[in-house]
Amino acid sequence: MTATSAMNPADVPHVYPKNKWLIAAAVTFGTLMGTIDTSIVNVALPHLRGTLSASVEEITWVSTAYVVASVIVMPLTAWLGMRFGRKRIYLAGLVLFLIGSFFCGTARSLPTLVVFRILQGIGAGSLQPTEQAILRETFPPKEQGMAMGLYGFAIMLGPAVGPTLGGYIVDNYSWPWIFYINLPVGLIGLVMVSRVVHDPPYLERVKGGVDWWGMTFLV
């Protein structure tokens, strides 16, 4: 009689990749863009207000919609990563962010811009938690502090650089370019992540449901 049994994920040896810093750089691209976009729009709001004929209260939704969408998505990211794979979720978030960036630049009405800022926020909200998970799986425990330091640097650098970068772009070009600038950087990150990031073999796919009541109260 032949006995077969499924291997316990805990029994699978964890082999850390040799190109760990390349992986760290790849996933930091998206996180840096996402954090920059929390503040890059702020300096362009007066220009957007005039172009879109919006009031002061209305134009603030361009910033608020992005932040709210990001915050709502973050709690779902861990469940989605376990169900579909962290690499897929990261790539999907980056693609959504880039699509949202492109259509934000083409928007010619406030409702349209807010809708695509929400799409941007959904994509960005999945990047930060997924990067943390990828870094923890990529680096051994003794090096995770340095990896998280890189992550923290991106989180701090984005909001600091955003207003300066946004002001320069608006003064020298036009407001759509604060969104279009994401495209070449994001495409580089997309190619890098697709080539160097791989889910570990022990990652379990969970089939549990979502706490929809919890998500409702969060919203």
Regions found by a protein language model. Give the residues of each.
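Hydrophobic transmembrane-helix bundles of small-molecule transporters
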Residues: 171-219
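Cytosolic juxtamembrane N-terminal segment immediately preceding the first transmembrane helix
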Residues: 1-36, 50
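Extracellular/periplasmic helix-loop-helix junction of adjacent transmembrane segments
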Residues: 44-73, 110-115
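Cytoplasmic helix-loop-helix junction between adjacent transmembrane helices
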Residues: 118-153
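Interfacial helix-cap and linker-helix signal at transmembrane-aqueous boundaries
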Residues: 48-49, 80-81, 165-173
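Helix-breaking motifs and short loop linkers at transmembrane-helix boundaries and internal kinks
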Residues: 51-53, 85, 106-112, 140, ...
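Conserved MFS/SLC helix-loop-helix module at the cytosolic interface between two early adjacent transmembrane helices
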Residues: 72-111
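Residue-level signature of mid-helix packing/kink "hotspots" within the transmembrane helices
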Residues: 39, 67-75, 125, 159-160
